[in-house]
Amino acid sequence: MVYNMDFLIAAMVILLLILWDFLGQKRADDLNNQIFLFFAVLGILDVAAELLSNYYISSGGGDFGLAAMLTTTVFYLFQALLPFTLICYIVTLHDNKMISAKKMLLPALPTFFLIGLVLLNPFTEKLFYFDLTEGYVEGSWYKLMYYSAIGHMAAAFILIILWSRRMGYRKTMVLLEILVISGSGVVIQFLDHSLLMTGFGLSLGILALFITINNPNVNTDSLTGVYNHLYLTR
């Protein structure tokens, strides 16, 4: 299969620019911004791993066997972590001081299970494996990665609706838009694996967060550069 990596390259450019701008500006040092920063960095690592994985897979050379297995496994690990990170981000908008470990235990269990499957995959070959003649081959449990992403997005949707009054109309609408954008990327790639849209949808979602909820300029006065009342009411 020939993969179209144009969207992945665009996603990498978008995410790097977001990270550069976010780190270069004065910002509120709260839990939500910390999770956003982690989310953005994880997104960059995810896209980078997918680019390398698809490069080695597409090369088809026997010398790239180990590199293809390693980069693809790392990419799958990031894919397992990203949906849970989105849940954590939403929770910080509800509990902006501290995340309860007990509250996060239940949504973390599917993620831990999926990470275990990814780490054991070189031995079980349930998610993917490499064949000398066919190259990259999807395993019998391959679609579990997509089901996990969709399931976490469904859980995120429920949390957003339940906590909409606490978070406010603006944040609620932004989060719902992000679910639509990111979810569309997952669905498109699920229907056509050659279109690598998951990373692109992720980058657009993080961009939407950056220019709205996590915009550093929102919390500072344009003349003095000090925090304004919006920072104090976060």
Regions found by a protein language model. Give the residues of each.
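Conserved nucleotide-binding and Mg2+-coordinating catalytic segments in signaling enzymes
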Residues: 214-234
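Interfacial "cap-and-anchor" motif at the non-cytosolic start of specific transmembrane alpha-helices
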Residues: 162-217
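Extracellular-loop-to-transmembrane junctions of the mid-late helices
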Residues: 2-10, 117-155, 189-195
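Hydrophobic alpha-helical transmembrane segments of multi-pass membrane proteins
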Residues: 6-86, 107-125, 175-190
